[in-house]
């Protein structure tokens, strides 16, 4: 067994781990990234899922990736090419739809099909979302202040947050409070009249969420559109040419030019400890690698309770970590299609604006709530709410044959644990068929053009990508699991109770999504401590 030594070992080659490695290398540290899978990228990868068809296998949209990370790591130089998705399409099984584009006149006419007032209400609503979202976004690339024993920089950061909030007027402060601690349905009902628009807004807060629309505190997810941007356009979402793996490939290439060592097929079994300090890791192969610091891109429960072990942690801290709520009730499907999906509500001879859109198959607010309640009872939602894309319409590099397509589906709500003693390995095919049958109501030619599919259940997301209970955020995004409490007040500044061990993944502030923010922030903290 070989023994090697580095300044820092990064556990996990996902986008945050690679981000951390880049910034540490920029600080002249010797860094080794250890990835357990055969490919780097974590959940942000592109792979062939059916012969001749490639796609973003897990993470599938870009918006939250911080512009600072893109520019500082020169990702575009290494192949990162975002594609703006300006359109949104909301079809339902009754034949109704909303199709929103870059044309204000077009959008006003679309909303007028359902309401005489919601268009103006939406403009005012999105104004508040943007204002509050700016305050949230301003904290993403900052280390959250500790809840006690704050230093001068922490106090200044807290003062700045207060100053930002003071700039808001009375109405803006009221809306901010609603977003931070309110229930989505209360906000939605207070703003909008039509069932269609209410469903559209409700759908926007579900992809990374696992909460009732009636749950106080669940409205934080409604701010995600304001925090993101593509090509400088606030609130926009997009695709990446070649799939999300192009992001992590660019990050890896950037890191390797800085001298970072990246190893795949190198699963870490435990973190080595000596004299109350983390000193290295042991791989499943038995190989030991040593370092002065460890940055864990794994989720907090895996990091602390499995790799480190409760014996090396304060008892109360370990109990708190074990109580972190993890689960997003998400199921991913990738469809291989021999032709273009034809929507019953909007047939077309070729790709239309609705094909170049983020597509949300949602019936109503009640549909979303019923899906949530079913999942809570351990039953896959029938039908699920589905967030979809047809990325091959704007990126023909994803398929080998002209005219063929891939379709991405994020299906909600799908519980990690099934009731009645059922398990996902036996239920996967049945649930997949139920999803396809539901989509066929709106895409009549789907069965005809479907040549294959990949289904990743919550259990698959855990096994394949290390997402605990299928949680795409490493821990639910709820008020008591955010900011200075993410994942715990004693680890919210990326340092942990174990000397030399840091967190750099989505389980740390500011949370999930392909942002690069936890990775960048953790690296800054490690470098700051390195100089002491």
Predicted regions and their residues:
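N-terminal glycine-rich phosphate/pyrophosphate-binding loop and immediately adjacent elements
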Residues: 3-148, 474, 521
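Active-site/ligand-binding neighborhood in enzyme catalytic cores
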Residues: 130-258, 467-481
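Extreme N-terminal leader/targeting segments of oxidoreductases
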Residues: 1-8, 26-27, 482-484, 488-489, ...
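A conserved FAD-binding loop/helix module that cradles the flavin
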Residues: 506-527
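FAD-dependent oxidoreductase catalytic-site/capping-region signature
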Residues: 384-480
């Amino acid at each position: 067994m070989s023994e090697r030594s580095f300044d820092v070992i990064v556990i996990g080659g996902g986008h945050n781990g690679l981000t951390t490695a880049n910034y540490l290398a920029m600080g002249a540290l010797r860094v080794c990234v250890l990835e357990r899978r055969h490919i780097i990228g974590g959940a942000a990868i592109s792979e062939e899922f059916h012969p001749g068809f490639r796609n973003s296998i897990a993470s599938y949209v870009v918006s939250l990736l911080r512009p600072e990370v893109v520019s500082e790591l020169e990702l575009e130089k290494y192949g990162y090419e975002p594609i703006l998705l300006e359109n949104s399409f909301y079809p339902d099984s009754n034949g109704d739809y909303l199709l929103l584009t870059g044309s204000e006149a077009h959008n006003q006419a679309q909303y007028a099909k359902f309401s005489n007032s919601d268009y103006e209400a939406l403009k005012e609503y999105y104004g508040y979302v943007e204002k509050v979202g700016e305050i949230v976004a301003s904290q993403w690339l900052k280390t959250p202040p500790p809840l006690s024993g704050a230093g001068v920089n922490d106090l200044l950061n807290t003062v700045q947050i207060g100053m930002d909030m003071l700039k808001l007027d009375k109405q803006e402060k009221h809306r901010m409070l609603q977003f931070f601690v309110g229930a989505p349905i209360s906000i939605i009902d207070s703003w909008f009249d039509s069932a269609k628009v209410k469903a559209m807004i409700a759908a926007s807060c579900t992809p990374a969420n696992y909460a009732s629309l009636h749950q106080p505190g669940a409205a934080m997810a409604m701010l995600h559109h304001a925090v993101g941007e593509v090509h400088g356009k606030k609130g926009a979402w997009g695709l990446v040419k070649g799939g999300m793996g192009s992001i992590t490939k660019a990050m890896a290439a950037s890191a390797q030019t800085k001298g970072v060592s990246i190893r795949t097929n190198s699963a870490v079994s435990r973190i080595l400890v000596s004299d109350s300090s983390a000193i290295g890791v042991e791989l499943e192969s038995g190989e030991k690698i040593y370092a002065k610091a460890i940055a864990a891109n794994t989720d907090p429960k895996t990091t602390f309770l499995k790799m480190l072990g409760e014996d090396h942690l304060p008892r109360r801290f370990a109990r708190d970590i074990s109580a972190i709520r993890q689960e997003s009730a998400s199921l991913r499907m990738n469809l291989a299609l021999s032709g273009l999906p034809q929507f019953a509500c909007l047939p077309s001879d070729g790709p239309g604006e609705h094909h170049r859109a983020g597509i949300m198959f949602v019936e109503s607010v009640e549909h979303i709530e019923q899906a949530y309640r079913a999942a809570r009872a351990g039953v896959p939602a029938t039908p699920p709410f589905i967030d979809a894309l047809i990325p091959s319409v704007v990126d023909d590099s994803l398929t080998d044959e002209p005219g063929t397509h891939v379709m991405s589906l994020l299906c909600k709500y799908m519980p990690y644990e099934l009731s009645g003693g059922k398990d996902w390995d036996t239920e996967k095919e049945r649930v997949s068929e139920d999803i396809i049958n539901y989509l066929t109501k709106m895409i009549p030619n789907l069965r005809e053009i479907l040549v294959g599919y990949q289904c990743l259940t919550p259990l698959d997301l855990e096994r394949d990508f290390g997402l605990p209970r299928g949680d795409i955020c490493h821990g639910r995004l709820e008020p008591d699991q955010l900011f200075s409490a993410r994942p715990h007040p004693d680890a919210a500044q990326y340092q942990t109770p174990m000397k030399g061990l840091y967190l750099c993944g989505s389980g740390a502030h500011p949370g999930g999504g392909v942002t690069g923010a936890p990775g960048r922030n953790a690296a800054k903290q490690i470098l700051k401590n390195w100089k002491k």
